[in-house]
Amino acid sequence: QDKLKSISANIDGGQPWRRGFGDNIVYTDWKKNNYFKAVKNEIKNNGRIGIEYDHINFENLKKLQYLLPDSEFADISKITMRQRMVKSDEEIDLIRNGSQVADIGGAACVEAIGEGVPEHEIALHSTSAMVREIAHRYPGSDIMDTWTWFQSGINTDGAHNPVSTRK
């Protein structure tokens, strides 16, 4: 492999470069299909391109095929998933720590439950406990995407439903 480069949206600023490996190209979405144009500028139009077909919709695949007509596209979904199943010691430690942090959040959730307590307050208590624990375990890190799903009533019909002010 000659180079490693990520292509990310302008809204993410420099974070993909800071948190990633290799170089990073930032594109704007001011014009339609700028992402695909950025991909075209980075990929030789005569090679073999691996794509996870289970992660790209038909329309976007067609855009890539149009922009790179001399390239061969290959489905790498299965081999990529097999590679993801192999974990390094560092990844296993992260998974263990994540499970322990989730247990702390679950205990905080149970601790906050009470008659008349809105579900959003219970979720906030749980999330705060987890964020504090993550900050303790990983000082100097960026903390993002940590939250608690704590739904009741009709919102229990789906995993990604929002918390509410229901008591």
What are the roles of these predicted feature ranges?
Residues 53, 110-119:
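Conserved short loop/turn motifs at secondary-structure junctions
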Residues 99-109, 119-127:
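Active-site pocket-lining segments that scaffold enzyme catalytic pockets across diverse folds
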Residues 1-105:
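A composition/biophysics-driven feature that prefers long, compositionally simple stretches
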Residues 87-90, 117, 121:
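A structural signal for alpha-helical segments
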Residues 9-15, 111, 133-139:
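A broad, low-specificity signal for short, low-complexity segments enriched in glycine/proline
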Residues 67, 77-79, 119-167:
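Short catalytic-site patches enriched in acidic/histidine residues
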